[in-house]
């Protein structure tokens, strides 16, 4: 969940498998007094979309899935979509240049990359996507769909796939 000072919230991926996870998520939104305004999906694998219906129905949102590359029209946030196929053909990253943040889903992880052995995966395509992603400023904070945050600079130095 990404928030601004006015407590508007963008939800990135809705990987809530079970009801207790959904309840915990809803409690967090309520406790922090957040107002969800968008649900962004990085790619349509179950671990990123299984809570999509819950989020859509609970907060009256329509998920943004596989948007066109370019600027997203979402109030309060400057979000740029970067197409990043390879792990899955519909994969995208969400870059927030004003905050220097990148949400990568399963495209880029700390010192690793997304799998390409699943349907829709292709290593050559993923490598091309990664070459575009690492062109972002070195101090860009990277938030992958799994694991720990990292930076573009760290990945350029230590990721064996780059």
Model-derived segments and spans:
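Conserved beta-strand hairpin/beta-sheet module of binuclear metal-dependent hydrolase folds
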Residues: 1-27, 32, 93-105
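Core dinuclear metal-dependent hydrolase active-site scaffold
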Residues: 1, 71-97
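Hydrophobic "anchor" residues on beta-strands that sit immediately upstream
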Residues: 9-11, 39, 63, 78, ...
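Metallo-beta-lactamase
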Residues: 16-17, 88-162
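Histidine-centered catalytic micro-motifs
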Residues: 39-49, 82-91, 143-149
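Active-site HxH/HxHxD metal-binding segment of metal-dependent hydrolases
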Residues: 16-80, 161
